[in-house]
Amino acid sequence: MAPPAKRARGLTLPGYKYLGPGNSLDQGEPTNPSDAAAKEHDEAYDKYIKSGKNPYFYFSAADEKFIKETEHAKDYGGKIGHYFFRAKRAFRPKLSETDSPTTSQQPEVRRSPRKHPGSKPPGKRPAPRHIFINLAKKKAKGTSNTNSNSMSENVEQHNPINAGTELSATGNESGGGGGGGGGRGAGGVGVSTGSFNNQTEFQYLGEGLVRITAHASRLIHLNMPEHETYKRIHVLNSESGVAGQMVQDDAHTQMVTPWSLIDANAWGVWFNPADWQLISNNMTEINLVSFEQEIFNVVLKTITESATSPPTKIYNNDLTASLMVALDTNNTLPYTPAAPRSETLGFYPWLPTKPTQYRYYLSCTRNLNPPTYTGQSQQITDSIQTGLHSDIMFYTIENAVPIHLLRTGDEFSTGIYHFDTKPLKLTHSWQTNRSLGLPPKLLTEPTTEGDQHPGTLPAANTRKGYHQTMNNSYTEATAIRPAQVGYNTPYMNFEYSNGGPFLTPIVPTADTQYNDDEPNGAIRFTMGYQHGQLTTSSQELERYTFNPQSKCGRAPKQQFNQQAPLNLENTNNGTLLPSDPIGGKPNMHFMNTLNTYGPLTALNNTAPVFPNGQIWDKELDTDLKPRLHVTAPFVCKNNPPGQLFVKIAPNLTDDFNADSPQQPRIITYSNFWWKGTLTFTAKMRSSNMWNPIQQHTTTAENIGNYIPTNIGGIKMFPEYSQLIPRKLY
């Protein structure tokens, strides 16, 4: 007896029964939702073939259904199939509705797309809105289907790369590259794609853990660049020839590019004040998990002006103009976070925003020769030169990063990037060296109620234990502590480098009761209308000073230095106060020279600043890494998310001169939608104290700060992020 014939498996992917060409329809139960969608797809193809149609050459309704079924697939086979049929949709002609095997049957019952493990069921999308398709049909009757699905010729290359890179990024929990990306067709010119979402989702995972998923969407306006070239520009001080003010030195060299940078690296892009209130009141720790962003619904328009007086502007949709998109996944280009310049995407989801121009520093030699070190009354020699030939690093996006070309209706996705960062505490510490360990034993306790009746201590020379002085005086000032909480650092010190003077950075800490802001690293924020300014009616910019909550600051004016060996009497020779000269030099103060940073130093991380603060930063490529960054609380151990660049491609006229650096161009601009998802994990606070704690809230007096005025003006106030106290020891 002959053995039973084996069922044809075709070229199915490993782990699947139906996902792949050439398999039979009786392989048993599908292995997962993607495999089930493939089984329905194969059955539809079988009906096409029996009706005399060729579904392999044409893009069919079955292909479109498979794309929708696998839109949220998490398995590799579902993603590969999803992107394969999207590429087919872009390049193959479409079967008419009468060719569908379902047209002669009963009307199909509408079902929601198949749910994939780990994905949310998508909400209902409205029917596609055709913006230009009707006009295109009138002008090109038989070719409208092909034109509406037009896409870059690189789609077949980029879609598989995007799928593969996204898979590798999903499996790489240690960060690494900036994620893979690629452009893809949107199903036709004028077809609405994507969604607008600015919600923040809090998913409670149990055991005190929370997953925070922040969604952000913005309408971005992009004009064509003023020029198509790269320009090396020297910048000198604005007051040339005037007596030099070294703290106002601005001289540098920068490379100006024709590209724009889309930067979402600021807390205000992702959270609103209510979100931040919930986070700061209930979370004690937070960490970055993943980040992805997308460009979609691209619209490109041209502007022509009539010869009349005054001229009339005419706006036309340009279906052939291109938007250039580049993602620096390997961080090849200079890293330029926009938050310190207040040039990120805007903080208000209902307002259109714009990207900032991409530029970076270039090496230069700065010559600044003050005539005297005792005053600023004389003129300072001011000059700048091109840097040494061994230091020049000129980068262009065109030869450093792959570039995708998008047309009207197209979209681009970066893929998922996974962070590798240290968790950030959302609590503040109140303990200083004076409050670490066991307090001294009291000699007597008060018997009368009231803080004005204190306890007493034994005589200083009768207390037991060990301390840091050679005499017998054991006081709270001389008691030994396990470590140095915070540290004293020189401030208002301007170091001088090859590029010119710069103020040494200080890790921001809270003030002492003496309100010494600058010695404790206070940060001054200045912002415009997109980032917190109340209205544009006033030319005065909005400003505020930020001081963290953690109480490890210093009061330099109260510091002193005792002579050795220690004398208990405060004689003139025994105590060095800030007003005392050092080495006979006038105006040289003790607090400017003392630095107590060392191996015993314990300090808190940089605090997050809502809304204007930067979220993550790139690690410096040095052998010895800094412990903290002043600009951002999260420092990526590997490459940070890749920078996203956009630029309108040159829209040239027939008047072209190859010997000219500038060519006549058709005035072109673009509006497109940007959206992103930033994911965190957080720990909820536990109530283990008796007393209630301070919370971020509103009052009848300040609620007006969070609502618009009668002309639509609204202000973004800075909010503290570390209200919950914690003990260090």
From Swiss-Prot:
Localisation per UniProt entry: Virion; Host nucleus
Motif position, Nuclear localization signal: 4-12
Q: Basic residues: which segments have biased composition?
A: 112-128
Key words of the record = Capsid protein, Clathrin-mediated endocytosis of virus by host, Cytoplasmic inwards viral transport, Host nucleus, Host-virus interaction, Magnesium, Metal-binding, Microtubular inwards viral transport, T=1 icosahedral capsid protein, Viral attachment to host cell, Viral penetration into host cytoplasm, Viral penetration into host nucleus, Viral penetration via permeabilization of host membrane, Virion, Virus endocytosis by host, Virus entry into host cell
GO terms for MF = metal ion binding; structural molecule activity
**Biological process according to GO:** clathrin-dependent endocytosis of virus by host cell; microtubule-dependent intracellular transport of viral material towards nucleus; symbiont entry into host cell via permeabilization of host membrane; viral penetration into host nucleus; virion attachment to host cell
Which regions are flagged for Gly residues bias?
Answer: 173-186
Q: Where is this region: Phospholipase A2-like?
A: 18-63
In residue numbers, the region (Disordered) covers 1-38, 94-129, 163-186, 437-465
User: SUPFAM superfamilies per the record?
Assistant: ssDNA viruses
Binding-site residues for Mg(2+), renumbered to this chain: N330
UniProt cross-references to Pfam families, sorted A to Z = Parvo_coat, Phospholip_A2_4
Question: Where are stretches of biased composition, namely Polar residues?
Answer: 24-34, 98-107
Q: GO CC: one term?
A: host cell nucleus
Source domain of life: Viruses
What function is annotated for this protein?
A: Capsid protein self-assembles to form an icosahedral capsid with a T=1 symmetry, about 22 nm in diameter, and consisting of 60 copies of two size variants of the capsid proteins, VP1 and VP2, which differ by the presence of an N-terminal extension in the minor protein VP1. The capsid encapsulates the genomic ssDNA. Capsid proteins are responsible for the attachment to host cell receptors. This attachment induces virion internalization predominantly through clathrin-dependent endocytosis.
- Note on domains (UniProt): The N-terminus of VP1 is sequestered within the mature capsid. It contains a phospholipase A2-like region and putative nuclear localization signals.
- Note on file? The capsids of autonomous parvoviruses expose a proportion of VP2 N-terminus and part of that sequence can be cleaved of to form VP3.
Record-stated family: Belongs to the parvoviridae capsid protein family.
The identity of this protein, by name, is Capsid protein VP1
Q: Which organism is it from?
A: Porcine parvovirus (strain 90HS) (PPV)
- What broad taxonomic lineage does this protein's source fall under? Viruses, Monodnaviria, Shotokuvirae, Cossaviricota, Quintoviricetes
